[in-house]
Amino acid sequence: MPLNPILAAVLAQRTEVSAPPMHEGSPEAARTMYRAMNAGYTREAVTRVRDEDADGVPVRVYHPNPGVVLPALVYFHGGGWVIGDLETHDHICRKLANAVPCVVIAVDYRLAPEHPFPTPLDDCYTALNWVTQNATQLGIISGKIAVGGDSAGGNLSAAISLKARDENGPAICHQLLMYPVTDASFDTPSYADNAEGYLLTTDGMKWFWHHYIGDEVDPAQAYVSPLRASNLSNLPPTTVITAEFDPLRDEGESFAKLLAQAGTSVSMRRYDGMVHGFFAMADLLEAAQEVFEFSAYQLAASFKTA
C-alpha cells in the first residue's frame, strides 16, 4: 500500500525545513525539537489530572471519573529512551483515559544518556510497584493493571512484563505495545526498506541505542532486547501495533509471533500506509483514531477478564 497521502504531505513539509535530523545534534536539542513537534495536538479534557511522586519517580495520573474505581494503564512514553516526557505524550494519555475508560498513569522516567540502562527500566518498575501498592488511594481496581507504551515505551513495557514475571512482581493483566522496539539489531528487511524518509530512521535508532546501552551492556539480554528472551511464557495478554513504513515493523511482528508461540494471547495489527509515530497523530489520521479505538477495546476486554 502506498504511503498515506496526509503523511506524505507532512513528510514533504519537513523535508523543506533545513533543520538537521535529531541524531546529528545533542540530546538536549533533540528534546527541544521533540517537544515542539508534539505541542500542537488536541488535549482532551479529563476530569482529574494530578502530578504525583511515585517513590521518587514523577508520574501524572489521569482519572476520567474520580467517583468510580477503575482499571489502570501504566504508560511509558516513547522517544528512544533519550527524548520525551509527560508533556510530549499528554494528549495520548488523556485520549486513552477517556476512551477505555481507565486511570492512566504516565511515567516520567529518567532519560539516557545521562541515565542509561537500566535506570529508565528501574524507574518504570518502581512506578508500577507504586501504582500497585497505592491502587485504593488512586481509585484503581487492584488486579486490573496493564502496562503500555509506544516505541521505546513499548520496549520498556515488554521488559517490565518480563521483569515482573521473573521477580514475582506486580500482576500485569495486559501489555499494549505500539510499534515497540524489541531488538538491538538492525538487520531486518524493514530496517533496510525504511532506513530513511519516514520520520524514524535507521541512523536515528542507532543513535538512540548508543545513548541507552553504550558499548558495555549486552544488547541481547532480555530486558534490553525482549525479542531475544529465552523464555517468553507466562506473560500477559498482548496487543501489538505496527506500521508499514517503520524500521521497527519486523521486530514488533516477530515479537508478537514468538509470544503467541509461547502460549500468550496476542492480537497484532499492522497499519499499512503508516509510519512510526502515527499513533500520536489522531488529529490528522483516521488510522490513528482507529488505533485508539482498537486499543481501548483490547484494554477493556482484558480488564473484564482480569
Q: What spans do the regions from the language model cover?
A:
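Catalytic active-site module of serine/aspartate enzymes centered on a nucleophile-bearing elbow/loop
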Residues: L284-A306
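Short beta-strand element of the alpha/beta-hydrolase
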Residues: V69-G79
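Hydrolase active-site cap/lid region
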Residues: L162-V217
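Alpha/beta-hydrolase active-site loop
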Residues: H115-Q137
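Gly/Ser-rich "nucleophile elbow"/oxyanion-hole loop immediately N-terminal to the catalytic nucleophile
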Residues: T132-V147, E167
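Short amphipathic alpha-helix adjacent to the substrate-entry channel of hydrolases
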Residues: E87-A106
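Short beta-strand/loop motif that positions the catalytic acidic residue
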Residues: V240-T242
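A glycine/proline-hinged amphipathic helix-loop "lid/cap" segment
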Residues: M1-Y62, K304-A306
